[in-house]
């Protein structure tokens, strides 16, 4: 595998401070939008908000900056001073430390600060405790307001800070340059801006964290320098401690949170530091091995139990240290994407009032709730993978043999309360007597304390987490019982509730109640095996290789070495371009809408009779056949492309950016992205630990400091080797930019000086840019060199990929979606006796069972039946896609892929397919769904919730999440969505003798099944991704170019559909009513579409629901619903006095020599406008086409 050479790009950035304190009067307009986008707990005056141009920062805000981080002595005598600058970018979040109470809280949940403090103590993490001396020198928000002439009761103060120096602010290593304050305009209002600089400016050649910032007599302070007052604001420091440092401490398993802050700040100031940054006295979580697993102490063989546990703990801290260093490198990166500008958000188009704009933002955030829920409830989510386990050496006889997979991340949420041990494995003081929960088989309930830990014990982030969870459902759509919140709250007044956070009047919004409502979806940690990581990321390129055959015949494979062709010429002959031409032609015919692949175009006005159906199907077939023939001719004749080998090497692929401004404008979504990145960094570092340990005396006290640089270099060497794409930048100061900084002698209230000289300390910078995720198109067997375990795994997969040898129901075949939607136009007489409503399920079931009376069929009907059966059987013979088309777009793309597979002689196994589960939003489908937002609690809860639903337009946040699936991913990915998916990173060496470690980011699964997302299906041939589109909402729209199997209502209903039969609709309705009971009436058309993936049946379900309510005089009655269903079933079961029946199975078998489509006898263009001839064409040719040999021009 060859990688692209690294290229250095010179980029110019302006010099500037490490941050600003913005001070403004509370805006009269836009405050509701800011509150919706922010994270704030109701019991706190602080908040975290997104960095948004036009909302929190001014237009023209420069995101990339060369930060003034210190000073250096220069000149012969060392008497002159120059400034030291480091590139960085501004954090995508801003931190409100005064006036946060003017923002509506993200949730009504009470006492979240108390919950976070209790959780922090329970899991052993340190609390924020300022030093007594610091409190004497606090710079309060009120004092700043007084200095700037603002009313403290109406002011809003927040910190905008560069990514690498947030921790420096939290440990008081910065000061406010009051003399450099200026004014900017945000949203038409004047805003004060005070620059923030590091104290290291006054300590030349001091590139470390200042342990005692308030010591004005520090020996490193330059001669005659006027040392400023360090910036210490207690609410801000606590906010940064909780929302910035806390999540990193949880991810890196470091109970001493302050030590993480100091380590990160030190890495920002000292660009040359490569040793250990985390403290030497770090502790580790003790946990028992899972049942049936060799105890960790014995895994290294030879009875060296202590050594085995020691290496596991050493790998844990060294991988965490390497991840922190890697995050520090990324924090110094310079990105191309500018911060999002609220005035350019497409979702505001046509929204003329403030209320309409707030509603649009509320609806969009509810979309993201589905992704947040998946990250919380998936057991392999990066949020839960907080511990390191040891699988033992790859070769028990040779402990030095390196293994990339010896150390790996495992879920640690449920064992976080276990005792803490030191590096030797001894329990540390304060944790004696604590019970030790096992990794697998524990009985811990997922509680509010666990949720607080996922948020780093930040009340603000926890409040925003609850904002999203309140918009998730408890998997009603898959048939689970959801708690009745009204009854629970009413009953709790007479019973003991195990919660000391709420009262009877606030219980409906309490975190405990929200988790109780979602109890069926709670993560269940039933495995500690090495597996995929559930990650949250963002697609920031509209290009992806997510077509049915992925990157088959891609530009890079067709490009000639001599470079004699233009890129446009090459691109026209790729598989991707061929699919674009097919879709464009079908869009011209008005069959599809490329921007919405699930849409049916204008087919409702086109298919008005059976002849129109013939025309549509034939046109689709001919368009595809023509493009495939031309594509294969160009590949073979023009380029000598090894088309069969190319199929074996084809992958579905996409890239997830590490650019922080590409994420959604929400602090919690940014947290999910950060935690995902930290998990990926640790996974890479853990793969190199065994190689670093091999042959070394790991017990030595100095081992970490000595070998941490080795591990760091190994991780850095993994860049650009297949998975983690990196970019090398040469950073220079902007042309003509003057370096302005505070005077070192005149004091912090003096104006800035622009006579400084300075240079960039990190001139050439290499940093990760994106993660490459891919999935092989073909099912690949184990290689000859694979291990026995790998061969066994592949053998277990073969049955899942094996194409079954059975005839598929016509309605579940390629034309099923057309036959169901347009049955009345195609077969107007295809209705049960005594019914006036044409019914496709009854018609095709009776037809295929040879039970349909022949007198009901005209000659035109028989010709159409022959045409449909011929197409369905021929398609089935060459089909290797384990999905039936749901629309014309899918029909065309699947047919095209199958034709290419036929040319390549593919056989036996289904290919891998992709499905996007697209997050959407809607108003609350029931009063219960709005319970958490009710202004009234206690006895008035139901009335309050009903009043909210009745006036729902007045509540911009009153939206809930929903999902829809789509099997054509390229248009979905072109919307540059936020995504959640499983990611498994393979590592391997290159060619023999090459010590470069290559990686592959494999598209894997989220564990937890329906807990993670109600529409996830256990199917090894399909890869799923949850997607929340950004283009068209918060950025410009782009132009088109294994968990355990769980039975659910979703699968039960699809099983009924796959079995077929005349009474499918009634059977589906009965199964739903028996499962959901009265909740069936709450299902809307979107829910039925998500459950059934069938538009016709979804409309039938809505009609049956309406009839059931009508039968019950407007009230839901299960008996009435079942009665309606049985009447519908009886109607379609009637065949009357059939007399002679039409023999569907034998009809047309007199011609055994018909040619399947795609062969030499395929109809020409003239066929599109005429009916198919009844005699002479075999509509029942069921045999697969003969295998082709080498492709020849005659075949083409």
From Swiss-Prot:
Q: How does it assemble?
A: Homooligomers. Forms double-helical filaments necessary for the formation of replication compartments within the host nucleus. Interacts with the origin-binding protein. Interacts with the helicase primase complex; this interaction stimulates primer synthesis activity of the helicase-primase complex. Interacts with the DNA polymerase. Interacts with the alkaline exonuclease; this interaction increases its nuclease processivity.
Q: Where is the composition biased (Basic and acidic residues)?
A: 1174-1196
Question: Biological process (GO) annotations?
Answer: DNA replication
Q: Which domain of life is it from?
A: Viruses
Q: What is this protein called?
A: Major DNA-binding protein
GO cellular component, alphabetical, reads: host cell nucleus
Q: Where in the cell is it found?
A: Host nucleus
Where are the residues of the annotated region Required for nuclear localization? Answer: 1170-1196
| Region (Disordered) residue spans | 1158-1196
Please give the Gene Ontology molecular function terms for this protein.
single-stranded DNA binding; zinc ion binding
Q: What does this protein do?
A: Plays several crucial roles in viral infection. Participates in the opening of the viral DNA origin to initiate replication by interacting with the origin-binding protein. May disrupt loops, hairpins and other secondary structures present on ssDNA to reduce and eliminate pausing of viral DNA polymerase at specific sites during elongation. Promotes viral DNA recombination by performing strand-transfer, characterized by the ability to transfer a DNA strand from a linear duplex to a complementary single-stranded DNA circle. Can also catalyze the renaturation of complementary single strands.
Family, according to the entry, reads as follows: Belongs to the herpesviridae major DNA-binding protein family.
Q: Lineage from the top down?
A: Viruses, Duplodnaviria, Heunggongvirae, Peploviricota, Herviviricetes
- What keyword terms does UniProt attach to this protein? DNA replication, DNA-binding, Host nucleus, Metal-binding, Zinc, Zinc-finger
What the entry lists under HAMAP family is as follows: HSV_DNBI
Identify the gene encoding this protein.
Answer: DBP
Zinc fingers classed as unnamed: ranges: 499-512
Species of the source = Human herpesvirus 1 (strain F) (HHV-1)
């Amino acid at each position: 595998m060859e990688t692209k050479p690294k290229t250095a790009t010179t980029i110019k950035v302006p010099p500037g401070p490490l941050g600003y304190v913005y001070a403004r009067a509370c805006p009269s307009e836009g405050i509701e939008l800011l509150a919706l986008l922010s994270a704030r707990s109701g019991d706190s005056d602080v908040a975290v908000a997104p960095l948004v141009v036009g909302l929190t920062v001014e237009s023209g805000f420069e995101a990339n900056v060369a930060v003034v981080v210190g000073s250096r002595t220069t000149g012969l005598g060392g008497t002159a001073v120059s400034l030291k600058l480091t590139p960085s970018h501004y954090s995508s979040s801003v931190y409100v430390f005064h006036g946060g109470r003017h923002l509506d809280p993200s949730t009504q949940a009470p006492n979240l600060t108390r919950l976070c403090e209790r959780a922090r103590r329970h899991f052993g993490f340190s609390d924020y405790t300022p030093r007594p001396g610091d409190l004497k020198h606090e710079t309060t928000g009120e004092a700043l307001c007084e200095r700037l002439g603002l009313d403290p009761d109406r002011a809003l103060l927040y910190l905008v800070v560069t990514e690498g120096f947030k921790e420096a602010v939290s440990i008081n290593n910065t000061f406010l340059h009051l003399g450099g304050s200026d004014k900017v305009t945000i949203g038409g209002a004047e805003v004060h801006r005070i620059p923030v600089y590091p104290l290291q400016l006054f300590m030349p050649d001091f590139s470390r964290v200042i342990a005692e910032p308030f010591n004005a007599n520090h020996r490193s302070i330059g001669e005659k320098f006027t040392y400023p007052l360090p910036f210490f604001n207690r609410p801000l420091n606590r906010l940064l401690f909780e929302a910035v440092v806390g999540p990193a401490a949880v991810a890196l398993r470091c109970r001493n949170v302050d030590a993480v802050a100091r380590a990160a700040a030190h890495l920002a100031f000292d660009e040359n530091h490569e040793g250990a940054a985390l403290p030497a006295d770090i502790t580790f979580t003790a946990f028992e091995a899972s049942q049936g697993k060799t105890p960790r102490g014995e895994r290294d063989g030879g009875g060296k139990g202590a050594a085995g546990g020691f290496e596991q703990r050493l790998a844990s801290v060294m991988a965490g240290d390497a991840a922190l260093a890697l995050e520090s490198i990324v924090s110094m990166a310079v990105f191309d994407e500018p911060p999002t500008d609220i005035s350019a958000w497409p979702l505001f188009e046509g929204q003329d009032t403030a209320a309409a704009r707030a509603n649009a933002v509320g609806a969009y955030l509810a979309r993201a709730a589905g992704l947040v829920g998946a990250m919380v409830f998936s057991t392999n989510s990066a949020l839960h993978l907080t511990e390191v386990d040891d699988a033992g050496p790859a070769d028990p006889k040779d402990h030095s043999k390196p293994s990339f997979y010896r150390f790996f991340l495992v879920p640690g949420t449920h064992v976080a309360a276990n005792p803490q041990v030191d590096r030797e494995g001894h329990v540390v003081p304060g944790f004696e007597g604590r019970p030790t929960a096992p990794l697998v088989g524990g009985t811990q309930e997922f509680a509010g304390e666990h949720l607080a830990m996922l948020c780093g014990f930040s009340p603000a982030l926890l409040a925003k987490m609850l904002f999203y969870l309140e918009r998730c459902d408890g998997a009603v759509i898959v048939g689970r019982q959801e708690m009745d919140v009204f009854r629970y709250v009413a009953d709790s007044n007479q019973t003991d509730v195990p919660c000391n956070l709420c009262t009877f009047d606030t219980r409906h919004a309490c975190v405990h109640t929200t988790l109780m409502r979602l109890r069926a979806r709670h993560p269940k940690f039933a495995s500690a095996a090495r597996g995929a990581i559930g990650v949250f990321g963002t697609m920031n390129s509209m290009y992806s290789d997510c077509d049915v055959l992925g990157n088959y015949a891609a530009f890079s494979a067709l490009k000639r070495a001599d470079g004699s062709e233009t890129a446009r010429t090459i691109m026209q002959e790729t598989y991707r371009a061929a699919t674009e031409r097919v879709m464009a032609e079908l869009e011209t015919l008005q069959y599809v809408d490329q921007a919405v692949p699930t849409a049916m175009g204008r087919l409702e006005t086109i298919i008005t009779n059976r002849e129109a159906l013939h025309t549509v199907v034939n046109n689709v077939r001919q368009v595809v056949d023509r493009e495939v023939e031309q594509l294969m001719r160009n590949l073979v004749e023009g380029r000598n492309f090894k088309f069969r080998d190319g199929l074996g090497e084809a992958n579905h692929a996409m890239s997830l950016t590490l650019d922080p401004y590409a994420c959604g404008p929400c602090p919690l979504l940014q947290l999910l992205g950060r935690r995902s990145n930290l998990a990926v960094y640790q996974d890479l570092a853990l793969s190199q630990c065994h190689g670093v340990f091999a042959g070394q005396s790991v017990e030595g006290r100095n081992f970490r400091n000595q070998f941490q640089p080795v591990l760091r270099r190994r991780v850095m060497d993994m860049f650009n080797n297949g998975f983690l794409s990196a970019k090398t930048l040469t950073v220079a100061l902007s042309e003509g930019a003057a370096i302005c900084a505070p005077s070192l002698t005149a004091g912090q209230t003096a104006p800035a000086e622009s006579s400084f000289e300075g240079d960039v300390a990190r001139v050439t910078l290499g940093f990760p840019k994106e993660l490459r995720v891919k999935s092989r198109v073909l099912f690949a067997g184990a290689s000859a060199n694979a291990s026995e375990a790998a061969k066994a795994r592949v053998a277990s997969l073969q049955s899942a990929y094996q194409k079954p040898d059975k005839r598929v129901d016509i309605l579940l075949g390629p034309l099923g979606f057309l036959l169901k939607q347009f049955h009345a136009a195609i077969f107007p007489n295809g209705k049960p006796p005594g019914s006036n409503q044409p019914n496709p399920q009854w018609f095709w079931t009776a037809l295929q069972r040879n039970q349909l009376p022949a007198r009901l069929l005209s000659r035109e009907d028989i010709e159409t039946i022959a045409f449909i059966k011929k197409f369905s059987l021929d398609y089935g013979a060459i089909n290797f896609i384990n999905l039936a088309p749901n629309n014309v777009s899918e029909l065309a793309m699947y047919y095209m892929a199958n034709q290419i597979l036929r040319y390549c002689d593919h056989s036996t196994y289904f290919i891998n397919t992709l499905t996007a589960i697209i997050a959407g939003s809607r108003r609350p489908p029931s009063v219960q769904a709005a319970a958490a937002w009710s202004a009234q609690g206690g006895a008035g809860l139901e009335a309050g919730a009903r009043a909210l639903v009745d006036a729902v337009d007045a509540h911009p946040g009153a939206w809930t999440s929903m999902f829809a699936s789509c099997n054509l991913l390229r248009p979905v990915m072109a919307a540059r969505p936020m995504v959640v998916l499983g990611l498994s990173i393979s590592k391997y060496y290159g060619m023999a003798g090459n010590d470069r470690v290559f990686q592959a980011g494999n598209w894997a699964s989220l564990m937890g099944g329906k807990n993670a997302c109600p529409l996830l299906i256990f199917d090894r041939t399909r890869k799923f991704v949850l997607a929340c589109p950004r283009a068209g909402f918060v950025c410009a729209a782009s132009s088109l170019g294994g968990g355990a199997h769980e039975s659910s209502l979703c699968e039960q209903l699809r099983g009924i559909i796959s079995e077929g039969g005349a009474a499918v609709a009634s059977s589906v309705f009965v199964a739903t009513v028996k499962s959901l009971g009265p909740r069936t009436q709450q299902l809307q058309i979107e829910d039925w579409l998500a459950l059934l993936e069938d538009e016709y049946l979804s409309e039938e379900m809505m009609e049956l629901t309406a009839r059931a309510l009508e039968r019950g005089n407007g009230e839901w009655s299960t008996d009435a619903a079942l009665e309606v269903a049985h009447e519908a079933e009886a109607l379609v079961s009637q065949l009357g006095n059939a007399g002679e029946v039409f023999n569907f199975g034998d009809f047309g078998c007199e011609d055994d020599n018909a040619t399947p489509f795609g062969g030499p006898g395929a109809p020409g263009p003239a066929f599109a406008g005429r009916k198919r001839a009844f005699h002479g064409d075999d509509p029942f040719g069921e045999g697969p086409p003969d295998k082709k040999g080498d492709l020849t021009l005659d075949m083409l």
